[in-house]
């Protein structure tokens, strides 16, 4: 198949865009021709470079929803943009178009473009939380606009886990086709893990006895880096050999540095900034502490599981993922219980092993690419059948 993957252009470093990279790789390995349509904004340059070796990159003049002051209210009326984009997509003659959106209101003009060009399409939405849930400005109006545009979309709307798909169905009251396809990450070579772990820990100046707790993600409110900091302070009191390392950058970086200094955690808590390759850090760590406020199915978490790292999350988050349980995940809600498990190597090895098996069985790039491949075939067949009926 000739597959056109479309980014709404929110950036190169978020999980949603890394998902697009993994999917493109997986589809290429399955011998499909992958085209990747990326907005020409400089923030997309990094993703374009990383994907150029396995996909044909197309840069286009397109403005992301969050580059408009009025957000989705602005994209609600930009029919000219949608028609221009539709014409460009149609000229590429893809068999199927796959639009990748961060949230409900992001890229609604791209869904309109898909309707206009008539090519079979699907759309992945990573976060299906409403603007009202997020307490955004003009939330009611923005939710109404998103509901209206999503309900008019004739393709399949894909959520990345069942809980998010259920919310999407309820929001649209059954007026759109919805489906769950789980995110996937590449397989990690277990043999390479041990050699790279030793080298990375030496580079970071870590002692063999240090227990390294990682945070992974952008330094933004959604990821709750200051909750990570509070957890670090509490865990350090009870586990003095613990060291805490945040891997990522963002708008809260300066505030984070001041908070570390204010809490006198220099030498205990540090930040590695943005890293193009997080795998060596995952190898060097002993635990991933994931405390984000809201998520879809975070790639950081399943990348850590694939690398054999035990992971700790909130019970609220784990309740949305039915295959997360006490065998393959730890919980941050009870600090004393977490401290006891941190001190038990047998428990950590068991949880890490179960997490790694979970990724291999359910959350691999291979499984994700195969599931999307089948969905593409289904929407192409459905479109062909509809054309036959209308012409008959």
Which residues fall in each region the model found?
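Aromatic "clamp/platform" in nucleotide-sugar-dependent glycosyltransferases that forms part
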Residues: 102, 274, 293
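An aromatic- and histidine-rich active-site surface loop
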Residues: 81-82, 97-117
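A short, active-site helix/loop in glycosyltransferases that binds the activated sugar's phosphate group
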Residues: 151-180, 185-187, 321
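Conserved acidic donor-binding segment of nucleotide-sugar-dependent glycosyltransferases
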Residues: 324-336, 343-346
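Short hydrophobic beta-strand element within catalytic cores of glycosyltransferases
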Residues: 310-314
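A short, well-ordered alpha-helix in the C-terminal region of glycosyltransferases
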Residues: 347-362, 368-374
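Nucleotide-activated donor-binding/catalytic signature segment of Leloir-type glycosyltransferases, i.e.
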Residues: 257-273
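A conserved mid-protein helix/loop that constitutes part of the nucleotide-sugar donor-binding site
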Residues: 14-25, 211-234, 251-257
